[in-house]
Design a protein with these regions (language model features):
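Central helical "cap/lid" subdomain
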Residues: 146-196
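Glycine-rich "substrate-gating" loop/helix at the edge of Rossmann-like oxidoreductase active sites
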Residues: 97-103, 203, 293-298
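C-terminal catalytic lobe of FAD-dependent flavoproteins
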Residues: 106, 245-342
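Dinucleotide-binding Rossmann-like beta1-alpha1 core, especially the glycine-rich loop
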Residues: 1-82, 204-206
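Active-site lid/adjacent beta-loop-alpha segment flanking the redox-cofactor pocket in flavoenzymes
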Residues: 173, 187-286
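A short coil-to-beta-strand element that immediately follows conserved catalytic motifs
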Residues: 40-42, 124-125, 175-181, 252-264, ...
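Short beta-strand to alpha-helix junction loop
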Residues: 13-14, 47-56, 96-116, 231-239
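Helical element adjacent to the flavin cofactor pocket in flavoenzyme catalytic cores
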Residues: 96-154
Length: 342
């Protein structure tokens, strides 16, 4: 999904550019003047807060509005008017992105990027990087598992969940690990509004519409969330014990649901603060980070790609200053904590 409901100004600005990019995808990604369809559904994000979390939610909304995001605060009465299917028990406040928030088809997004890159002359090589070769204070080449050596003027680490392992090849510490996340597809017996926004309950459980059904998930508690290098098994107990009780309480129509499908994938999880690590390495001149987005990678990729381009081309940020996301904070152990993580 794409949203602006963050607590850090840079993340909000990244989200604003992200939605502009998605809504104008044909302008940015078209090849041979073909229309680019990303399956964009602009149905909004609805964050719900208990009494304990309402101050933070309100403060976040003020910052989001200052940045130009279209986010409205709703008290329980207005929540019930706008979303009559919602149980407001235990909810003190909600914030709703009424414009510029929604979701898209990630495979269409990836394929559109790939097609545009190829049209502009990019070459894709398939393989695993097994060695990074340095000469003085620069990366000179990488070696693939096939034995092929690829020279480089710049190396951008955009290895997703395996970014930490790639950085280690250059003897760089990067606290990014794979964390398994599971999405469950649902069919609801009771007829419910097919344009359900992405609802984030105060419990952390989220659910949204998907086609004629719904999808839901949650970031599991720490003791159920180990680093996951090769485990892609779907844990149905997570749905039964945590997700279903929460969504059935918040949206009573979900008391009678059937799990129709489920799948697992990886977050590139930054263990320091769940925020991106962006920009050059302080000592290796041509090594750049685009890592650790902890589930926000798709929506943040347009702005991050532009930022890395600016650094390589101009030696500085020209649009959004992302200096606070530098690798220096990792070295110093200074967390830049985002309060709106899904």
């Amino acid at each position: 999904g794409v949203r602006q409901q963050f607590s850090i100004r840079e993340n909000i600005e990244i989200g604003l550019y992200g939605v502009d990019f998605v809504k104008n995808a044909s302008q940015y990604l078209s090849v041979d003047n073909e229309t680019v369809d990303l399956g964009w559904r602009e149905l909004g994000y609805l964050f719900l807060a208990s009494a304990e979390g309402q101050r933070i939610l309100s403060e976040n909304q003020q910052l989001q509005s200052q940045c130009g995001a279209k986010i409205e605060i709703l008290n329980p009465e207005n929540l019930k008017i706008k979303f009559p299917w919602l149980n407001i028990d235990g909810i003190a406040l909600g914030s709703f992105g009424y414009e510029g928030e929604g979701w898209l088809d990630p495979s269409l997004f990836l394929n559109a990027f790939r097609a545009k890159a190829r049209a502009l002359g990019a070459t894709f090589l398939h393989g695993e990087v097994t060695e990074i070769v340095k000469y003085k204070q620069k990366i000179s080449s990488v070696i693939l598992d096939s034995g092929v050596q690829v020279g480089c003027s710049f190396l951008v680490n955009a290895a997703g969940a395996w970014a930490g392992a790639v950085a280690e090849l250059a003897k760089i510490r990067l606290p990014v690990v794979p964390k398994k996340r599971i999405i469950y597809g649902l069919d609801c017996r009771e007829k419910l509004n097919p344009k359900l926004p992405l609802v984030i309950d105060a419990s952390g459980v989220f659910i949204r519409s998907e086609g004629t059904g719904f999808v839901c998930g949650v970031s599991p508690p720490a003791h159920l969330d180990p680093n996951s290098w090769d485990d892609m098994e779907v844990d149905y107990s997570l749905f039964d014990e945590i997700i279903w009780p929460a969504i059935a309480h918040r949206i009573p129509a979900f008391e009678a649901v059937k799990v129709t499908n489920a799948w697992a994938g990886w977050y590139d999880y930054n263990t320091l603060d769940q925020n991106g690590v962006i920009g050059p390495h302080g000592e290796i001149d041509n090594f750049f980070f685009a890592n650790g987005f902890s589930g926000h990678g798709l929506q943040q990729s347009p702005a991050i790609g532009r930022a890395i381009m600016e650094l390589i081309t101009f030696g500085e940020y020209r649009t959004i200053d992302l200096s606070r996301f530098s690798h220096e904070r990792i070295i110093r152990g200074l967390a830049l904590t985002e309060r709106n993580v899904v």
